[in-house]
A protein has these predicted regions:
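Inter-motif core of Ras-like GTPase G domains
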Residues: 222-242
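Well-ordered beta-strand positions
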Residues: 212, 234, 292-296
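Phosphate-binding loop that captures ATP/GTP phosphates
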Residues: 121-181
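Beta-strand-loop-alpha "switch" segments that mediate conformational coupling across diverse proteins
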Residues: 272-274, 286-316
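Acidic-aromatic/histidine active-site loop/patch
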Residues: 1-99, 160-163, 255-258, 264-266, ...
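Walker A/P-loop phosphate-binding motif and the immediately C-terminal alpha-helix
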Residues: 93-144, 206
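Cytosolic-facing regulatory segments adjacent to core modules
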Residues: 161-220
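Arginine/glycine-rich "motif VI" loop of SF2 helicases in the C-terminal RecA-like domain
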Residues: 122, 256-264, 287-292
Length: 373
């Protein structure tokens, strides 16, 4: 599948459904993205006397084998005083929330949930940025209908300078639909281990430029995944009716706690509810094993959902009147409201499909039984 140079140039100037160069100057836009990123990177560089270990790794080390952070083990880190901002500074005070989908076993459907939730957010009038951090073998671009994926590894070289410029970010982006833009994975899986710093810089920019950031993760956590999970405002622990789903989910929750995510920011997401073998009892066992106060159930989409996702039609999947689409829309709206997003009414597509009658069927050229042919 082609990467980078094979993609038409007209798709390269759009992120979140708008033109970056023309329409993001009134906010802290990409035109000056180098300066804020450079300042943020300087603040995060290890100072003399400080450890060069990432913040999430410091928390894991402090937690030790118990997984608990004692108050005495975390010493306050002195924060240098920030320079006074001028009166005309236009830096937004609010940063977009980050929603990470994690799981302890593959095949539970978290990529489908991320893809459909991103489209649901766009139907609510939000600009959704999507990161596929299954860097080696992720296929979120397939589920979102991208024909020619861009290589996220192009961010490795510019990130060495401590900042990402607008052309670098746009080149690695894929405009999926108005309000939905995707980054990732990498074309060469062996470059995945080099993506920690680029992902941190990209995530910092996207939190300023978008309304919500959705992150799909891999079962194996590298530095990039751990940093994204540590920065998340909501961690979706996804599982299904598989035998090992509940056990692996509880282990993921423990790891997320050790990298700094409190359990109050986690939600137990039981996927494919209502399918064969995924009844109320199985869902309750999963939720009890997770022991989280926030619970979400996503209804089974069946073969109809599988057919749509196989052709990259996640937008149609979330716009239907099926039980799956309804559960995704309701869960997404409730979560975004809790995270403080300014959600609007559902777009006309959802309203039209909600009132639309059943699709007319083709009348075949023969009569009913008993009628003359």
């Amino acid at each position: 599948m082609p990467y980078g140079d094979d993609v038409p140039a007209e798709d390269m100037g759009y992120v979140h459904g708008i033109n970056l160069v023309d329409e993001l100057d009134e906010v802290e836009g990409f035109a000056g993205a180098g300066e804020p990123c450079a300042a943020a990177s300087l603040a995060s560089e290890p100072q003399p006397g400080q450890s060069a270990m990432p913040a999430w790794a410091q928390r894991v080390t402090a937690a030790g084998e118990t997984g608990m952070l004692s108050p005495a083990s975390v010493s306050p880190v002195p924060v240098p005083s920030a320079p006074a901002l001028s009166a005309d500074a236009s830096i937004p005070s609010r940063r977009a929330p980050v929603v990470c989908a994690v799981s302890g076993s593959g095949g539970c459907g978290k990529s489908t949930i991320v893809a459909t939730m991103a489209h649901a957010a766009s139907l609510l009038g939000l600009r959704a940025a999507v990161l596929d951090l299954d860097l080696m073998f992720g296929n979120l671009y397939d589920l979102l209908g991208v024909d020619a994926p861009h290589d996220m590894a192009t961010l490795i070289e510019p990130s060495a300078a401590g900042a990402l410029a607008e052309p670098d970010i746009v080149t690695a982006s894929m405009r999926v639909a108005p309000g939905v833009t995707l980054w990732g994975p990498v074309a060469a899986p062996e470059k995945a281990e080099l993506m920690a710093r680029p992902v941190e810089l990209l995530l910092d920019v996207l939190r300023r430029e978008s309304d919500v950031v959705f992150v799909d993760t891999s079962v194996f956590w590298g530095d990039a995944v751990a940093a994204a999970v540590a920065a998340s405002d909501r961690c979706l622990v996804v599982g299904d009716a598989a035998v090992s789903s509940a056990t692996s989910a509880s282990r993921v929750i423990e790891l997320a706690s050790r990298v700094g995510v409190p359990r109050t920011r986690m939600s137990a997401v039981f996927n494919r509810f209502g399918a064969r073998g995924a009844d109320e009892d199985v869902a309750m066992r999963f939720e009890i094993a997770c022991a989280l106060s926030s619970k979400i159930r996503i209804a089974d989409g069946g073969q109809d959902l599988a057919a749509l996702m196989a052709f990259g039609r996640a937008d149609e999947a979330v716009g239907q009147t099926s039980a799956f689409a309804t559960s995704v829309r309701e869960a997404t709206r409730e979560m975004l409201v809790e995270l403080g997003c300014a959600v609007g009414p559902w777009s006309d597509m959802v309203a039209d499909r909600a009132t639309r009658t059943e699709r007319p069927r083709i009348r075949l050229p023969w009569s009913r039984e008993g009628d003359p042919r």
